[in-house]
């Protein structure tokens, strides 16, 4: 407990030092307050674009694994300009699932495990994507799971149970996302609607281009477009998925940036490293590392975009930690030369551990300290959509 308090205190002090160093004095002075009480520095650029990267199941140990294996200072995570920690509990369980956590990150509201895009009473909870669409902003999602899975679904769907994949898919086909890349073709080719019209046909009727092969990404220049690149989830990295996530992220950014410019608006893109979680459920350390390396390349693509486009905020976080991953020494005698390290999992499920938030780009100094996942979501809405209400009172 004492060590935990020391670590948290160090994180807060580092965040304060960074905020003062870049001129975000107002943030530093109020750092001991809840994020809902923080006012932005007047000399900071407004946040126009949000790139929201979610490593499903990614805890601090998963990031540490990447850094240890890649060499400190070489990963996209090392480029972070600010950091925070978030709690992940759901409305009915201290250990969340991806549906409840995704709903919190997308909508600013807690819900029960298994519930997606709805409040505990099953009332629809509007996501930041829906808010952005109403404001005329292009939006998109890029994942390595099915597009109907919990995290992406939280940004556009409303169902009482996360495994209602066909119902979620039917809602996807009726959504106003500008770009969506992932798996889930088998659901897009079917329907539970009374008219029986498959989602793919509905999308085409609505003017969407529909892709089924990742090689078609190179042919794109604008949306609306949805790509369903596998019947279910895309393959594991070990099974040849290649650089799909990075390529799809870069293509989505290209399309959204162009359309945002034409509309004189910003954009929001959510990118998920979906299969970090799946490999951690399997307690597959090599698989986790491969998925983390893949996600790291997508994070780097987002940061590179932010470097070229002032007004872009990159937020990298997780919905929860999976596997209870620890990294002990292979030798308990630390006074001798290192004998190596080990990667050990304590569970095949999720844990209640806090997860990290890495921030980069415009507005990165405004979020720091220890907060809840819903508070992070409220801050992001306020930064990207300031006309939606004061951060101290955002009830919607």
Predicted segments with their positions:
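Positively charged n-region of N-terminal signal peptides that target proteins for export
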Residues: 3-6
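Hydrophobic membrane-insertion alpha-helices, especially the h-region
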Residues: 9-21
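N-terminal catalytic scaffold of extracellular/periplasmic and nuclease hydrolases
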Residues: 21-217, 223, 321-396
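Structural motif
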Residues: 52, 180, 227-229, 268-272, ...
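Metal-dependent active-site segment of extracytoplasmic phospho-/sulfohydrolases and closely related
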Residues: 60, 293-334
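Functional beta-strand-loop-alpha-helix junction segments that form "active/interaction loops"
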Residues: 119, 210-249
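Active-site His/acidic residue clusters
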Residues: 150-155, 232-240, 257-266, 270-298
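Active-site regions of oxyanion-processing enzymes, predominantly non-cytosolic
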Residues: 213, 217-228, 250-274
């Amino acid at each position: 407990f004492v060590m935990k308090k020391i670590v948290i205190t160090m994180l807060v002090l580092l965040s304060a030092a960074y905020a003062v160093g870049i001129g975000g004095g107002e943030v530093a002075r109020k750092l001991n307050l809840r994020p809902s009480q923080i006012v932005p520095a007047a000399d900071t650029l407004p946040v126009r674009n949000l790139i929201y990267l979610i490593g499903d199941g990614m805890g601090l140990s998963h990031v540490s694994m990447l850094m240890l294996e890649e060499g400190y200072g070489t990963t996209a995570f090392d480029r972070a300009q600010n950091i925070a920690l978030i709690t992940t509990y759901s409305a009915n369980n201290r250990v969340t699932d991806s549906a409840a956590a995704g709903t919190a990150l997308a909508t600013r509201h807690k819900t029960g495990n298994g519930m997606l895009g709805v409040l505990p009473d099953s009332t629809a909870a509007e996501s930041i994507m829906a808010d952005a669409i109403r404001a005329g902003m292009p939006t998109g999602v890029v994942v390595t799971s099915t597009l109907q899975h919990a995290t992406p679904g939280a940004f556009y769907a409303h169902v009482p149970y996360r495994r209602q994949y066909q119902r979620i898919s039917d809602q996807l086909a009726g959504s106003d996302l500008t770009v969506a890349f992932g798996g889930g073709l088998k659901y897009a080719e079917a329907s539970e609607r009374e008219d029986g019209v498959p989602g793919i046909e509905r999308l085409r009727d609505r003017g969407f281009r529909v892709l089924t092969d990742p090689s078609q990404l190179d042919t794109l220049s604008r949306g609306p477009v949805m790509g369903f690149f596998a019947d279910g989830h895309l393959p594991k990295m070990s099974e040849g998925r290649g650089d799909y996530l990075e390529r799809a992220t870069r293509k989505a950014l290209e399309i959204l940036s162009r359309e945002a410019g034409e509309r004189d608006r910003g954009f929001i893109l959510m990118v998920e490293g979906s299969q970090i979680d799946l490999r951690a459920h399997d307690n597959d350390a090599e698989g986790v590392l491969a998925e983390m390396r893949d996600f790291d390349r997508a994070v780097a693509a987002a940061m590179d975009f932010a470097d070229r486009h002032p007004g872009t905020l990159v937020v990298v976080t997780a919905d929860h930690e999976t596997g209870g991953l620890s990294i002990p020494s292979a030798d308990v005698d630390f006074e001798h030369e290192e004998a190596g390290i080990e990667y050990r999992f304590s569970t095949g499920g999720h844990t209640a551990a806090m997860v990290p938030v890495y921030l980069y780009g415009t507005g990165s100094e405004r979020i720091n300290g220890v907060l809840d996942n819903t508070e992070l979501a409220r801050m992001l809405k306020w930064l990207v959509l300031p006309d939606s209400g004061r951060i101290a009172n955002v009830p919607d």
